[in-house]
Amino acid sequence: FTRRYGMYHLPILSFKEYVELKLNKSFESQRLENILENHVDIANDIIKNLENEKILKNFEEYIKIGAYPFYFENKDNYTQMVLDTINTILYSDLGSIYNISGDKINSLRKLLTSICVSNPLELSIESLAQKVGTSKVTLYKYIELLHKAELLRHVVYEGKRFKSMQKPDKLYLANTTLLSSLCLEPQIGTLRESFFASQLSVKNSIYYVDKGDFLKKKK
C-alpha cells in the first residue's frame, strides 16, 4: 500500500480576500499595472461596493490580524494562536526537519525579535550576528530557513543580481500580522513596506532599489 499525498502552497490572505471574508462581498481582482493607471476609478468602485464600511478602518484591521483565516474562527485568542503557530514552526517543523537543537531554535526566535525592533536598512549582518550570538555564516543559514518557513522575508538590493554590491540586505517579518503580534509598537513605515512586499511577492520576485522602495520581477 502506497500512501499518496498532494502538496499545495496556500499564501496568506490578501487584503482583498480578508475584506471579502469579513463582509461577505466580492471584489474584482486587479493587476498592479491597472491599479497604477486607473486607481481613482478602481477606488471609487470599491468605496461604492463597501457602502457604509470604511476602507481605511478595514485596512488597519488587516494590518494587525488579517493574514491568517483562522482569525474568523477564534477572534478572542487570535494573537496567542499566531504566537503558538510561530512556536510550532520553529520547534516542531524546523526542529524536526533540519534536526536543529533547542538552543539554536532559541537563536532563530531571537533573530525574529531582533528584526522586529529594527528598521530594515539599519540591520547589518555583522551587528545582527552579534545580537543573535552566532557567526555570519550560521546567520545566513538561519535567514534562509526562516525565509523558507515564511516567517521572514529576505529582500536584496536589485544591483546584487548582476555584480557584487556593498549594500545591506533588507529583512522583514513575512507579513504584518507577524509584525503586529511579535512587536509591541511596530513602525508605520516598516508596516507599509512589509504589507506591500507580502502582497507582491506571491507571484513576483522583489528587490529594493535606490529610487522608490521595490522593484518587482515576474517569477
How would you label these PLM feature ranges?
Residues 1-106, 116:
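Interdomain motor-coupling "hinge/lid" segment immediately C-terminal to the ATP-binding subdomain
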Residues 72-218:
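Accessory nucleic acid-recognition modules appended to NTPase machines
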